Regions:
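Cationic, low-complexity basic patches in intrinsically disordered or flexible, solvent-exposed regions
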Residues: 3, 20
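Structural signature of PLP-dependent enzymes
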Residues: 313-331, 338-367
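Conserved core of the PLP fold type I
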Residues: 95-96, 101-246, 256-258, 266-269, ...
Length: 437
């Protein structure tokens, strides 16, 4: 006998239909599903999601048949030849892995054994009190995005934080992940479009106005998209505001090594560590190792004691288990081999330094060319920004004109990836920008 009120799913050949069970079920069916196919009932009201504002740029670029075109949208490092290189240290590690023929068994939920310890040493320094005391929990994640997702879910669902604050502007996925988790987002001002510079006074004012237990997302270096970073004195002010206001800092470190060097770029994080606060760090190795498709990152939660960190680790694993269960191994093996070997680590720092210097040279080349052309705006600010990106101040209309008339593709908000520039296209890009100003 069928229970009253059920709507049964019935397969008829290759067709799937809804069928009522009993009088109550028939009433529900007649009121809601009459004349509808099952797929109509489930998905017919959906509308297409908008294209990703960053990845959509690359899609448009690829569809452009013109031979002279430039992709300044996606944030990936490229050589002067326009390719994303495989680092020598990565080649060596992959060769060793192939020879070792390691079984493809599951990794632990927290990731590859030893990986977290070496990540902590890179982030905080090998002699850091945090590392030596064991009062931080580090878990391997699916890139930096995965670290943000796990950390934001942990703080919302486990720790009960309901308000988050991100810089205005910020990387778009910050707000998307926070919104999906359920946070109310209160942005803090960061960038002054009228002067194309950091607006620190406004940032301080907005941070001071945030309620206690607000998760504050901070860019530790190479701010995305503006390229403007805080100096040490400004970081001291931010740390004091977080301490007095009971705010929870979440530092996103996607570009360690791309501003001044691995240790130099960890300055802000090490200042937070010295303050004694509890905070979170998202680390990405996508850029620094050019391992974009391996999805290798880490989430670190700094606690007040080892006992507290051990408990936090159990909760982080619970978040991961009901999400993706456990992380992939290949990228972790590569990164762990390099971080754990002083000689390989030094080689990696050298290769990373080469990438950093190429980006700097392209910043200077763009600024110099804009000056030579006598552009309507002074573009010297590009050399004062750091990292892969420059916030150009171009309007959405100017960005669209670059794409349509010149085959130069950038993010709608005016962000360009400096890595897309090279010695063959920088003059063309500068000339095109000058013409749309």
């Amino acid at each position: 006998m069928q229970p009253e009120g059920l709507i049964l799913v019935v397969a008829v050949g290759l067709d799937v239909r809804l069928q009522p069970a009993g009088p109550i079920g028939r009433k529900i069916f007649n009121n809601n599903y009459t004349g509808m196919h099952m797929s109509d009932a489930l998905f017919s009201s959906l509308v297409a999601a908008p294209a990703d504002p960053i990845l959509g740029v690359t899609q448009r670029y690829r569809q452009d048949p013109r031979p002279q075109k430039v992709n300044l949208g996606v944030g990936a490092y490229m050589t002067d030849e326009g390719v994303t290189p495989v680092l020598d240290v990565v080649k060596e590690a992959e060769t060793a892995l192939a020879e070792a023929c390691i079984p493809h068994s599951y990794l632990p939920i927290s990731g590859l054994d030893g990986y977290g310890a070496h990540v902590q040493q890179m982030v905080f320094g090998a002699d850091s009190e945090i590392v030596l005391s064991g009062r931080a929990a580090t878990i391997q994640t699916l890139g930096g995005t995965g670290a943000l997702k796990v950390g934001m879910d942990f703080m919302f669902h486990i720790c009960g934080e309901r308000v988050a604050s991100t810089s205005l502007p910020t990387w778009g996925n910050h707000n998307a992940i926070l919104g999906m988790a359920g946070y109310e987002i209160k942005p803090y001002r960061y960038y002054d479009a009228s002067t194309n510079s950091l607006n620190f006074d406004a940032m301080v004012e907005d941070l001071k106005a945030l309620p206690a237990k607000t998760l504050v997302v901070l860019h530790s270096c190479c701010h995305n998209p503006t390229g403007y970073d805080l100096n040490e004195e400004q970081w001291k002010v931010v740390i004091e505001i977080c301490q007095k206001g009971g705010l929870t800092p979440f530092l996103d470190m996607a570009y360690q090594g791309f501003r001044d060097g691995l240790d130099e770029d960890a300055t802000a994080i090490r200042m937070f560590a010295a303050s004694g606060m509890s905070f979170l760090v998202a680390t990405s190795f996508s850029k620094s190792f050019n391992l974009y498709n391996e999805r290798i990152g880490a989430l670190t939660v700094v606690c007040q004691s080892k006992t507290e960190a051990d408990i936090v680790m159990t909760q982080l694993k619970a978040v991961v288990r009901c999400n993706y269960s456990n992380p992939p191994a290949h990228g972790a093996y590569i990164v762990e081999r390099v971080l754990s070997d002083p000689q390989k680590y030094a080689h990696w720092k050298q290769e990373l330094g080469g990438m950093r210097e190429r980006i700097r040279s392209m910043r200077k080349a763009l600024a110099d060319e804009m000056a030579r052309l006598g552009a309507k705006r002074d573009f010297s600010f590009v050399t004062r920004q750091a990292g892969m990106f420059s916030f150009t101040g171009l309007t959405p209309e100017q960005v669209e004109k670059l794409a349509v008339d010149y085959g130069i593709y950038a993010v709608k908000n005016g962000r360009i990836c400096i890595c897309g520039l090279n010695t063959r296209n920088v003059e063309y890009v500068a000339k095109s920008i000058a013409e749309v100003l």
